[in-house]
A protein has these predicted regions:
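Short, charged, surface-exposed secondary-structure boundary motifs
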Residues: 49-52, 114-120, 236-238
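A conserved helix-loop-beta module that forms one wall/lid of the active-site cleft
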Residues: 106-173
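General beta-strand structural signal in soluble alpha/beta enzymes
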Residues: 16, 41-42, 83-84, 105-108, ...
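ATP-binding N-terminal substructure of ATP-dependent carboxylate-amine bond-forming enzymes
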Residues: 5-110
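Short acidic-hydrophobic, aromatic-tinged amphipathic segments that line or gate anion-handling sites
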Residues: 57-65, 137-141, 177
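Internal nucleotide-binding/catalytic subdomain
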Residues: 173-288
């Protein structure tokens, strides 16, 4: 156990990597632990340290896309545990660098984090392992993508599809298309995403139904499901407008037991098993 021997109340320092409401919530959970004395959130934000019962520090002298800058923060505060929560930091290999430098870091490695940071790899992983997924094609050419959607809409004029950036796009990378004009426009928008997130993009079948997600915590071999959630993915009510991050969620989601069992067996169990068989054990929180 990572706090084995830490029998004193208020003993540990925890570093949380991230800067938004997620990290605020995570820091509040650590604050309730009798084992935690001090919490550092990097880069954090001004509100995170407000009105706290324990010492909560924010340190903005780092970039989430620069693992070395986060390592410097870790060396400064010498935390007992580092919780790497943010997508960009995981995708950049922050956990790998921290672990190689002797720190106890919670989160997936850069290779395992591709299940979120590289949508092309993620869909191919699902296909290899028989995990249910929408039909998809990926492209690195705007022209090829446009030719494909022209052919698709010539056969299915009212098809719902999503044009999706393969890389990390702050929750904004999936663009809904209900006709050819929208699809062509959304393919053109792929070049607007920073850091080349849309250099490779997917054209995916749109699925109709109730959307929700499950959280599982895994050590790379075993796992436990502990939460479900239904998040608001679009800017406006009633699923209108572009997708974005930070619009809030409801937890737990209203899911019947048979569906929950199916999610466990067909999605989470299969994903943990498959990623382990590919020698990329996933440790941390898996959100499917």
């Amino acid at each position: 156990c990572w706090f084995q021997g830490a029998n004193m109340v208020e003993h540990l320092t925890v570093l949380i990597v991230g800067c938004v409401a997620r990290e605020h919530t995570i820091s509040s959970a650590y604050e309730r632990s009798p084992h935690v004395k001090r919490i550092v959130v990097a880069p954090g934000n001004d509100f995170i340290a407000y009105g706290r019962q324990k010492e909560v520090i924010t340190d903005g002298n780092c970039s989430l896309k620069d693992p070395m800058s986060i390592l410097e923060i870790a060396r400064k505060y010498e935390p007992d545990l580092i919780d790497v929560a943010q997508d960009d930091a995981l995708g950049a290999g922050t956990v790998d660098l921290l672990q190689e430098s002797g720190f106890l870091a919670f989160g997936p490695t850069q290779a395992a984090a591709r299940i979120e940071s590289n949508k092309r790899w993620s869909r191919e992983f699902m296909k290899r392992n028989g995990i249910p997924h929408p039909n998809f094609r990926y492209f690195d050419s705007e022209k090829d993508g446009i030719n494909y959607v022209k052919e698709l809409y010539s056969r299915y004029p009212h098809r719902l599809i999503y044009v999706k950036a393969s890389g990390l796009a702050a929750g904004k990378g999936a663009l809904r298309s209900e006709n050819l004009e929208q699809a062509i426009r959304n393919i053109g928008r792929m070049r607007e995403f920073p850091d080349g997130a849309g250099d490779v993009f997917l054209v995916e079948e749109g699925l109709i139904g109730e959307e929700f997600s499950y959280y599982a915590i895994s050590d790379g071999a075993t796992y436990r499901i502990f939460k479900s959630a239904q998040d608001s993915k679009t800017v406006f009510n009633f699923d209108e407008g572009d997708q974005t991050g930070g619009m809030g969620s409801v937890s737990p989601a209203m899911v019947t037991s048979p569906i929950a069992e199916e999610i466990d067996s067909k999605l989470i169990k299969t994903a943990i098993k498959g990623i382990g068989e590919e020698k990329l054990p996933y440790t941390g929180i898996l959100y499917l």
